[in-house]
């Protein structure tokens, strides 16, 4: 689609950021420090690039279509241990998705009624296995336009 074509042009071959089908996927390493939900500076910069394009795309969506940008957080399958902030990967993935949504609303001016934050923990992997590479692929934030 034109939307994903524009995203590819802006982001080029940025490491840790890719487009797969109808989803825009950030590696968690680009956005967050390990086991943290606060956006890193690099993550803020990448989100700002994407939101600039999202605004243009949103303006092109016909008025009768009630859309939302889904922000989905995913983790690897390594259990969280001894974290004062998160009891498990469900909580970490939800907190990361919410951190992205709040940044988009509070810092970038996205309308809050057009965003949703969802956490899936380790239960929707894109790579199978326990290798470092598989786990890295599964630690991600996905953005997807969908109808409400």
Give each language-model segment a name.
Residues 1, 31-54, 58, 67-148:
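Periplasmic OmpA-like peptidoglycan-binding domain that tethers envelope proteins to the cell wall
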Residues 1-20, 25, 38:
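Extracellular/lumenal/periplasmic "stalk" regions immediately C-terminal to a signal peptide or transmembrane helix
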Residues 7-18, 59-68, 104:
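Phosphate-binding glycine-rich loops and adjacent basic patches that engage nucleotide phosphates
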Residues 16, 21-30, 62-66, 77:
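Short, charged, surface-exposed interaction patches
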């Amino acid at each position: 689609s034109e939307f994903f074509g524009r995203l590819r042009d802006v982001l080029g071959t940025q490491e840790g950021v890719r487009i797969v089908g109808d989803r825009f996927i950030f590696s968690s390493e680009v956005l967050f420090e390990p086991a943290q939900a606060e956006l890193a500076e690099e993550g803020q910069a990448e989100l700002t690039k994407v939101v600039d394009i999202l605004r243009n795309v949103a303006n092109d969506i016909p008025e009768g279509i009630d859309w939302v940008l889904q922000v989905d957080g995913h983790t690897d399958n390594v259990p969280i241990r001894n974290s004062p902030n998160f009891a498990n990967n469900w909580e970490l993935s939800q907190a990361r998705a919410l951190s992205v949504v709040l940044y988009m609303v509070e810092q970038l001016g996205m309308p809050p009624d057009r965003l949703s934050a969802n956490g899936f923990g380790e239960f929707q992997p894109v790579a199978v296995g326990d290798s470092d590479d598989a786990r890295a692929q599964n630690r991600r934030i996905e953005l997807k336009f969908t109808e409400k």
